């Protein structure tokens, strides 16, 4: 995966951009967080768990979908949302974690070393374990993975948590 992505003319600029964003998050957010009591971010801000850890501040990560690794619910960004006996949610989470680790882990660990923090082994688990995960989706659209060991709550959909829908059709 690494060599294919590094040699891809289409993927290389994205990878470079993402790693640059992570470096800038460390550079810019640490001084800001030192002046505040808590860090609130989306789940796509890759450096924030390490930044909050370094600054010894609590972190609330928000997500508009179930975005914590588990065995029952697949990642919201990957295909196969219906049960599949071969490509299970656990396999999809492992695949997503491998892709995410490839894209962000080395850059995060480079910055963690710069700030005297131990390296992380797995970005997905590190971020989930080091934050309070606040899920912004309607409780009426389903529950969460019973295997989640991370601290979380469902806050409801930020635009309209009371809309009507066909529950039978949704379950299919």
Where are the language model's segments positioned?
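Alpha-helix initiation/capping motif
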Residues: 1, 84-88, 138, 166-167
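Short, charged, surface-exposed secondary-structure boundary motifs
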Residues: 1, 69-76, 163-166
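Conserved nucleotide-sugar donor-binding subdomain of glycosyltransferases
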Residues: 2-49, 87-123, 128-129
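Short, mixed-charge, low-aromatic patches
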Residues: 4-8, 61-70, 155-159
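Conserved nucleotide-sugar donor-interacting segment of glycosyltransferase catalytic cores
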Residues: 21-88, 140-142
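A nucleotide-sugar donor-handling region in carbohydrate enzymes
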Residues: 96-172
